[in-house]
Regions:
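Transmembrane-helix motifs of polytopic, lipid-linked glycan transferases
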Residues: 171-195, 232-233
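Membrane-lumen/periplasm interface segments of multi-pass, membrane-embedded glycan/lipid transferases
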Residues: 132-144, 300-372, 393
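Transmembrane-helix signature of polytopic, membrane-embedded enzymes
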Residues: 80-83, 186-212, 228-229, 242-244, ...
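Hydrophobic/aromatic-rich transmembrane helices and adjacent perimembrane loops
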Residues: 109-110, 224, 378-382, 399-426
Length: 560
């Protein structure tokens, strides 16, 4: 960079782009979660980021931070810091989030863990409950013949790893440990890419460790922490470039593809495999492609294995590539979301908000390395772009999530590209001053604010869950009409040993209620106690259908 004015021009350009997108998001963000999160969380942090960007390049604004000492890191220091951070995140899982699985995605990890802990791939569902499978677990179930058994529709590796980890420690510690492993792997990648630049190594680790998204998701059981950790371990092995390390990376790839959703890891890995081809390493690239094709076929056929393990015949079109395309891919391709542009604007702004506030300018400064095709700079950038495009096309609405979780596995890419930007431009005082000031603002401003907001959002749902759990009845019907969020309170163990057993109202009829009353007592969760969190919409009244279900319950089985 030749002058201060160039960095000033970059930051002003970024500030103008963010201001325009933020204005568009404020006017057009879809209702419920996207609008709620943008207005209550992201917009306030974006305002702070805009202040930093507009002030960048001004010597008085950042001069004080240039006197901060340089940091030199080694593996021992990083590993010790990562271990300490893992313990703090483990504590935060309980202190901030009550170790409560807020979303259906998170609950299904708990559900699958209980299934796998019993030594099965799918738990048998008693015959008398099979007609009520959808009411017992409304979303994300494999559709096994006759509902004879059940397990989530997600790939199993995340829950399997959690099951194995739970044999030796608290399962809630697994994601903090994975986040710590990802940090060490990110530092290892930076050491290999920038062996002569301790500052670049420190910046890569800084971008990772001060990501509010990394911290928040590590305190949940979302699979995204695993995606990030496995991706960075994969890249660390890939960069070693030996036969053994490539074999290790391929093994990690098998786990990463089956972790949660098949699509995420291949989008990360494909640019690096193509990089091997462009470097003339055709055989190695071919081995990766062949192995990944086999892994894809294996995981696509996983429903067939689940059915066979339960002694069931798979339904036509359920297993294999044809079933995967018919049941998983085509619905996403055929049912397009007309709000794609608005959602992706909100998603990307949310991602920027939940990262270190210095990340975006550093990514802009890495463009020179990307343009020069230096080392793996292009594959790092291509992985980010591929994932954004794929998610915009396939699934622009993420629902719940701290930050933009569909980009979570690429945070390591962003951190390494930011390190490139630092290495190329750290000789400029204004760059050093901006990064240090923005990092301090992140550490003492945006991270505490976002953690407070996330904890405040989760707490009422955890309280509602405990309230429902204390209802003195064998079963409770939860009014899930008109709301995508009340239905998340319908959560049961796979062996149905929890009391009360919870059922979603919109899958039941008055005849079902009369039948269920022959098995025990029933209570009804009214909408009033469920409306514990304002989602930016009017309160949802009790529906006629829900009232009809309650009226159908014989007096002798009804509990209030």
């Amino acid at each position: 960079m030749k002058s201060t004015s160039e960095f000033r021009r970059i930051t002003l350009t970024l500030a103008c782009i963010i201001a325009v997108l933020a204005g568009a998001a404020a006017l057009s963000a879809p209702l419920l979660l996207p609008r709620l999160f943008f207005l209550r969380q992201d917009s306030l942090v974006l305002a702070g980021l805009l202040g930093l960007l507009f002030g960048a390049g001004g010597r008085p604004a950042f001069a004080w931070s240039r006197r901060l000492p340089a940091v030199r890191l080694d593996y021992r220091t990083v590993a010790a810091g990562a271990g300490a951070a893992a313990l703090l995140l483990w504590a935060g899982t309980y202190l901030l989030f009550d170790n409560y699985p807020l979303t259906r995605d998170e609950h299904m990890v708990v559900f699958d863990l209980a299934v796998f802990r019993s030594g099965r791939l799918a738990a048998p569902l008693p015959p008398e409950w099979r007609a009520y499978a959808a009411a017992l677990t409304p979303d994300f179930l494999f559709h096994l013949p006759g509902n004879a058994a059940w397990v989530s529709s997600y790939m199993p590796v995340n829950a399997m790893l959690r099951t194995l980890f739970g044999m030796i420690a608290d399962p809630a510690l697994m994601n903090p440990v994975l986040a710590a492993a990802g940090a060490v792997a990110t530092f290892d990648c930076a050491r290999r890419l920038f062996p002569k630049s301790g500052g670049a190594q420190a910046v890569a680790l800084l971008m990772y460790a001060t990501s509010a998204q990394v911290l928040a998701l590590a305190m949940t059981n979302y699979a995204m922490t695993g995606h990030l950790a496995l991706n960075m371990i994969w890249l660390s092995l890939y960069l070693r470039g030996t036969r053994a390390s490539h074999a290790g990376a391929i093994g990690i790839g098998f786990l990463a593809i089956g972790l949660h959703q098949i699509v995420f890891h291949p989008l990360f890995a494909l640019p690096f495999i193509d990089h091997l081809r462009r470097q003339g390493q055709w055989r190695t690239a071919a081995v990766y492609c062949g192995c990944y094709a086999l892994f894809g076929l294996f995981w696509i056929s996983y429903p067939h294995l689940v059915a066979l393990s339960a002694g069931l015949q798979t339904q036509t079109g359920m297993s294999g590539g044809g079933g995967f395309i018919t049941n998983r891919v085509l619905p996403l391709l055929l049912h397009r979301d007309h709000r794609t542009v608005q959602l992706m604007v909100v998603n990307l702004l949310r991602f920027v908000t939940w990262e270190n506030l210095a990340l975006l300018p550093l990514l802009a400064l890495s463009f020179g390395a990307i343009r020069r095709d230096e080392s793996i700079a292009r594959p790092l950038a291509y992985g980010i772009l591929l994932t954004i495009l794929a998610m915009a096309f396939l699934l622009p609405y993420q629902g719940h999530g701290w930050g933009y979780r569909y980009l979570h596995g690429l945070i390591g890419n962003c951190a390494l590209l930011a390190a490139w930007g630092w290495r190329d431009h750290c000789d400029r005082d204004e760059v050093r001053g901006f990064v240090r000031t923005a990092s301090l603002a992140t550490l003492f401003g945006s991270i505490p604010f976002l953690m407070w907001q996330a904890a405040a959002f989760v707490r009422p749902y955890a309280q509602a869950d405990r309230t429902i759990g204390r209802i003195n009845a064998n079963m409770v019907v939860i009014n899930a009409d008109y709301s995508d969020f009340r239905v998340d309170q319908v959560r049961n163990l796979p062996d149905l040993t929890n009391r009360p057993i919870r059922l979603a109202s919109y899958w039941l009829t008055p005849a079902d209620i009369r039948m269920l009353c022959s098995r025990g007592t029933i209570a009804f969760a009214d909408p009033g106690p469920m409306d514990l969190h304002d989602l930016g919409v009017d309160r949802v009244p009790s529906s006629n259908k829900f009232d009809a279900l309650r009226a159908a319950a014989p007096v002798q089985c009804l509990r209030r």
